[in-house]
């Protein structure tokens, strides 16, 4: 190759390098330009793609000391005052390969943890992305104690503040600003997405809200009420994880083939009404490893029953069958659920010594009457969001061990009734996808890889990625008829055993054939 023929390549390389240098230079000087009310910049740094970013200030309970980032980006870390006695920690990640889209991430549990994995995921897809710590640090509810401003941040203010500041910074950093704004969150993040829809309908064009923790106060009470059913691990009513496996296997035996295929996955839990008495140990049985006692059978029946309040009002629907193996270690483990204990101690009763083992349904009434800052997130009239042109795509794993997928079905029904809209009308702006074989936000026995985060990624194509499906809906008007999930052989990044199209509610998946259950085209939404 002659020197002359090298010139175009050198020119191209120089242009690329200049673009990179210009981006780095813009990032280096950006902090000096930020002069927004109540915003205190901690640092601004350029982070090249491939960096394993260390997070020394991340609370140890958040469980993340580092995060690999895939895209070149400008990282802005700041604190934002939300009142005279409260503030949020906020980060904005601005990718060099920017698509003109703004996005806010959410949180989980009671946590004050920036979800760096979601920042990395969405920045890698070209979104200008923000994430906040919800107004406190760590996963404990203790920061709520005698600090109503912190509770208010957690209830709604952290997300909205991050959106307002994040949009301003995005317009400052990119001369083109942004065209559309999105939200991605699951669990508490799902609740935050719906809170934005209900309270700030103009914040987002598209909201992807998974396994939403709305009906929040009753969810807190429902989660702790399992202890009153199971008792401690020395109680006759307690089931060990091994016993729960016996229960789970029997539920799958009874309900698996209702959808037409024997694949270990329950496609529609509404049709599953298991009879647990079938596995009560026979009198005098010497081998009790594959059966349970009558007292334990009553426990299972109560666990799989709706949760009612003191006056007989439904507070929370049943735990959906099929989640037993995942739930046995977190809510059926013979201890009061930790997040619920914290909420009652530090919010409801302002008493760090409150004894969670003494909880009764009367306590649920006290908590619901309190409902600070309407954290319930249970408003069924979302017409303002509809009128603003917003779209919401919500999904919920039907093996969810922490938040019953039946609660998402209940909210869907409440919206339909409150707004007087049937499924066809709701489909214009609100689509709900139950995901068979998916546990809480990720994991599970089935095709849970829907692209709602790094741990479920199976490609960026809209048909394989729930976030990009939302982008296509907002920007091209192509609404998702299904969301495709991938069944991984050994977690994300491993081989895909099969894919399945998860149906839009209220449709359900039925195996029609021909072909194996692993063929997604052998299934039909009816």
From Swiss-Prot:
<feature type="active site" description="Charge relay system">
    <location>
        <position position="440"/>
    </location>
</feature>
<protein>
    <recommendedName>
        <fullName>Probable feruloyl esterase B-2</fullName>
        <ecNumber>3.1.1.73</ecNumber>
    </recommendedName>
</protein>
<dbReference type="InterPro" id="IPR011118">
    <property type="entry name" value="Tannase/feruloyl_esterase"/>
</dbReference>
<keyword id="KW-0719">Serine esterase</keyword>
<keyword id="KW-0732">Signal</keyword>
<feature type="disulfide bond">
    <location>
        <begin position="255"/>
        <end position="272"/>
    </location>
</feature>
<feature type="disulfide bond">
    <location>
        <begin position="27"/>
        <end position="74"/>
    </location>
</feature>
<dbReference type="GO" id="GO:0005576">
    <property type="term" value="C:extracellular region"/>
</dbReference>
<keyword id="KW-0106">Calcium</keyword>
<feature type="binding site">
    <location>
        <position position="261"/>
    </location>
    <ligand>
        <name>Ca(2+)</name>
    </ligand>
</feature>
<dbReference type="InterPro" id="IPR029058">
    <property type="entry name" value="AB_hydrolase_fold"/>
</dbReference>
<feature type="glycosylation site" description="N-linked (GlcNAc...) asparagine">
    <location>
        <position position="311"/>
    </location>
</feature>
<keyword id="KW-0964">Secreted</keyword>
<dbReference type="GO" id="GO:0030600">
    <property type="term" value="F:feruloyl esterase activity"/>
</dbReference>
<dbReference type="GO" id="GO:0045493">
    <property type="term" value="P:xylan catabolic process"/>
</dbReference>
<feature type="disulfide bond">
    <location>
        <begin position="186"/>
        <end position="441"/>
    </location>
</feature>
<feature type="glycosylation site" description="N-linked (GlcNAc...) asparagine">
    <location>
        <position position="516"/>
    </location>
</feature>
<keyword id="KW-0378">Hydrolase</keyword>
<feature type="disulfide bond">
    <location>
        <begin position="281"/>
        <end position="291"/>
    </location>
</feature>
<feature type="glycosylation site" description="N-linked (GlcNAc...) asparagine">
    <location>
        <position position="52"/>
    </location>
</feature>
<keyword id="KW-0479">Metal-binding</keyword>
<comment type="similarity">
    <text>Belongs to the tannase family.</text>
</comment>
<keyword id="KW-0325">Glycoprotein</keyword>
<keyword id="KW-0119">Carbohydrate metabolism</keyword>
<keyword id="KW-0624">Polysaccharide degradation</keyword>
<keyword id="KW-1015">Disulfide bond</keyword>
<dbReference type="GO" id="GO:0046872">
    <property type="term" value="F:metal ion binding"/>
</dbReference>
<feature type="glycosylation site" description="N-linked (GlcNAc...) asparagine">
    <location>
        <position position="233"/>
    </location>
</feature>
<feature type="active site" description="Charge relay system">
    <location>
        <position position="400"/>
    </location>
</feature>
<feature type="signal peptide">
    <location>
        <begin position="1"/>
        <end position="18"/>
    </location>
</feature>
<keyword id="KW-0858">Xylan degradation</keyword>
<feature type="active site" description="Acyl-ester intermediate">
    <location>
        <position position="187"/>
    </location>
</feature>
<feature type="binding site">
    <location>
        <position position="263"/>
    </location>
    <ligand>
        <name>Ca(2+)</name>
    </ligand>
</feature>
<comment type="function">
    <text>Involved in degradation of plant cell walls. Hydrolyzes the feruloyl-arabinose ester bond in arabinoxylans as well as the feruloyl-galactose and feruloyl-arabinose ester bonds in pectin.</text>
</comment>
<feature type="glycosylation site" description="N-linked (GlcNAc...) asparagine">
    <location>
        <position position="137"/>
    </location>
</feature>
<feature type="disulfide bond">
    <location>
        <begin position="503"/>
        <end position="525"/>
    </location>
</feature>
<dbReference type="Pfam" id="PF07519">
    <property type="entry name" value="Tannase"/>
</dbReference>
<feature type="disulfide bond">
    <location>
        <begin position="62"/>
        <end position="113"/>
    </location>
</feature>
<feature type="binding site">
    <location>
        <position position="256"/>
    </location>
    <ligand>
        <name>Ca(2+)</name>
    </ligand>
</feature>
<feature type="binding site">
    <location>
        <position position="259"/>
    </location>
    <ligand>
        <name>Ca(2+)</name>
    </ligand>
</feature>
<feature type="binding site">
    <location>
        <position position="265"/>
    </location>
    <ligand>
        <name>Ca(2+)</name>
    </ligand>
</feature>
């Amino acid at each position: 190759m002659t020197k002359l023929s090298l010139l175009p390549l050198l020119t191209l390389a120089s242009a690329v390098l200049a673009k990179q240098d210009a981006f780095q230079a813009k990032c280096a000087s950006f902090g000096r330009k930020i002069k927004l009310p109540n915003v205190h910049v901690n640092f601004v740094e350029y982070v090249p793609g491939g960096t394993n970013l260390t997070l020394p200030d991340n609370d140890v309970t958040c469980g993340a000391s580092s995060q690999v980032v895939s895209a070149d980006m400008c990282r802005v870390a700041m604190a934002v005052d939300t009142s005279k006695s409260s503030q949020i920690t906020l980060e904005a990640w601005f990718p060099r390969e920017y698509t003109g889209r703004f996005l806010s991430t959410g949180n989980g549990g009671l946590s004050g943890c920036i979800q760096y994995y979601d920042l990395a995921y969405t920045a890698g897809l070209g979104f200008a992305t923000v994430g906040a710590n919800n107004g406190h640090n760590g996963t404990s509810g203790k920061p709520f104690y005698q600090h109503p401003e912190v509770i208010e941040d957690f209830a709604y203010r952290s997300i909205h503040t991050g959106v307002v500041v994040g949009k301003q910074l995005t317009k400052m950093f990119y001369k083109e600003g942004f065209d559309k704004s999105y939200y991605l969150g699951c669990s508490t993040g799902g609740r935050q997405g719906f809170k934005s829809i209900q309270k700030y309908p103009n914040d987002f064009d598209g909201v992807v809200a998974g396994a939403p923790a709305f009906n929040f106060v009753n969810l807190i009470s429902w989660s702790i009420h399992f202890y009153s059913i199971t008792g401690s691990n020395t109680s006759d009513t307690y089931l060990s994880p091994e016993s729960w496996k016996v229960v789970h296997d029997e539920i799958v035996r009874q309900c698996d083939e209702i959808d037409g295929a024997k694949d270990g996955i329950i496609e529609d839990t509404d049709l599953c009404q298991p009879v647990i008495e079938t596995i009560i140990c026979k009198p005098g049985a010497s081998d009790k490893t594959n059966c349970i006692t009558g007292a334990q059978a009553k426990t299972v029946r109560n666990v799989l029953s709706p949760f009612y309040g003191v006056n007989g009002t439904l507070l929370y629907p049943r735990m959906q069958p099929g989640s037993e193996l995942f739930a046995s270690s977190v809510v059926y483990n013979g201890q009061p659920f930790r997040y619920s204990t914290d909420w009652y101690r530090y919010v409801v009763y302002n008493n760090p010594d409150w004894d969670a083992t003494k909880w009764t349904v009367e306590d649920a009434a006290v908590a619901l009457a309190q409902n600070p800052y309407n954290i319930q997130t249970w408003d069924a009239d979302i017409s303002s969001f509809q009128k603003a042109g917003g779209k919401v795509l919500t999904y919920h794993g039907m093996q969810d061990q922490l938040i019953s997928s039946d609660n998402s079905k209940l909210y869907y029904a409440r919206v339909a009734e409150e707004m007087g809209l049937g499924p066809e009308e709701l489909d214009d702006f609100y689509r709900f996808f139950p995901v068979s074989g998916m546990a809480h936000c990720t994991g599970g026995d089935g095709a849970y890889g829907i692209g709602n985060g790094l741990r479920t990624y199976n490609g960026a194509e809209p048909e394989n990625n729930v976030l990009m499906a939302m982008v296509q809906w907002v920007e091209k008007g192509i609404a998702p008829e299904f969301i495709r999930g991938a069944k991984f052989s050994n977690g994300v990044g491993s081989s895909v055993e099969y894919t399945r199209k998860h149906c839009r509610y209220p449709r359900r998946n039925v195996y029609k054939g021909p072909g194996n259950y692993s063929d997604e085209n052998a299934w039909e939404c009816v």
